[in-house]
Amino acid sequence: MSLQAPKGTKDLLPTESYKWQYLENKFRNIAADFGCREIRTPVFEYTELFQRGVGETTDVVQKEMYTFEDKAGRSITLKPEGTSPAVRAFVEGRLFNETQPTKMYYFTPVMRYENVQKGRLRQHHQFGIEIFGAKEASVDAEVISIPVRIYKELGVEGVELNINSIGCPKCRKTYNEALKKYLSKNYDKLCSTCKTRFDKNPLRILDCKVDTCKEIVKDAPIILDYICGECKEHFESLKNYLDVLNINYKIDPFIVRGLDYYSKTVFEFITDDITICAGGRYDYLIEEIGGPSMPAVGFGMGMERLLLTLQEKAIEIPEEAYVDLYLGNMGDKAKLEVLKLAKELRDRHIKCEIDHMGKSVKAQMKYANRIGAKYSMVLGEEELNTGKATIKKMEDGQQIEVDIKDIDTLIKVFK
């Protein structure tokens, strides 16, 4: 029996990797335009980080984390989300002592034990932006504008931005009391998980995926009616900034997000009923993890879900030829010259491929065509004697005679 990848994981094969490289390069360039620099954090962290950051009553912590003890008996968890590790690194690195704001981005694998389905894997990859140190609603709008630009540049249409405010701990306390009063009428119909959330964190019930609970919360009190004056002013400012940036949005009063660290602004980008990007403000997480009281905002974008969206919308990612020149050979002497020539060209950043299989010239040209080489050139006894060879443009068959010893002129063909 042949071994297979674990359930809920997917190999990224060379035939698909160009799509990821294209997106990653685009995202890096866009992040740089906003002044963000890259951060990389470990693939596993101490479990306490996610218990304190994400929240013990969340589905992520209760049901979805890959947690184990290491040989020293320490509880370790594979990273289920990207924000808490970024905050931990920010605090541990004492970046809060630097001039603020601190802007960072990351690409990271994320592991959650979820039901495997379309667009949902147990290991997926996330692109994230985190901005620390700025409390104004203008930075929320700036963060939201990054996915907007990404979708515009990729040509993704039909993406809906939904926003909400879940207030601060002070006004959320008032809302939780109203929510519990409403939910108490249907307490017996709540799922077992939501019954445990009822006293500890009733807001989490709004995020439950069980049908009976979803039906119950349809007529629940709306949190926007309970937020304090400061949170209301922040939300109004956000809407004004989005209007100035010509970013369309809808207010969805039931967006709460599945992670406990959020406060004030929360948002989701949705297409075809699938959330492809989400985020919000988390003004209390840095302090919770051991740093100073400092505001922050960010988002996470699932790479696999984005690629699925591009596929469903028939948006093709351009594939650049990964071979500039296929160097064919006829005979052992020619192969030696091909090896030397390939080295010189590769040293000048010309992507070359040569034959290592002893194929016939016909088979070599067939292979060159299959791998999408831009040009091909074959060296044999005649080419070695004359020092001249013919480069063939694979796309249209155009031929150019070149001096195989004149590397500078040869390189100009590919530029």
UniProtKB/Swiss-Prot annotation:
Q: Name one GO biological process term.
A: histidyl-tRNA aminoacylation
Q: What is this protein called?
A: Histidine--tRNA ligase
Q: Which GO terms describe its cellular component?
A: cytoplasm
Write out the annotated subcellular location. Cytoplasm
Tell me its EC number(s), please: 6.1.1.21
Secretion signal span: none
Coiled-coil segments: none
Protein family per UniProt: Belongs to the class-II aminoacyl-tRNA synthetase family.
Species per Swiss-Prot/TrEMBL record: Clostridium botulinum (strain 657 / Type Ba4)
| Reactions performed catalytically | tRNA(His) + L-histidine + ATP = L-histidyl-tRNA(His) + AMP + diphosphate + H(+)
This protein's assembly is summarised as: Homodimer.
The alphabetical list of record keywords is:
Aminoacyl-tRNA synthetase, ATP-binding, Cytoplasm, Ligase, Nucleotide-binding, Protein biosynthesis
Q: A single Gene Ontology molecular function, please?
A: histidine-tRNA ligase activity
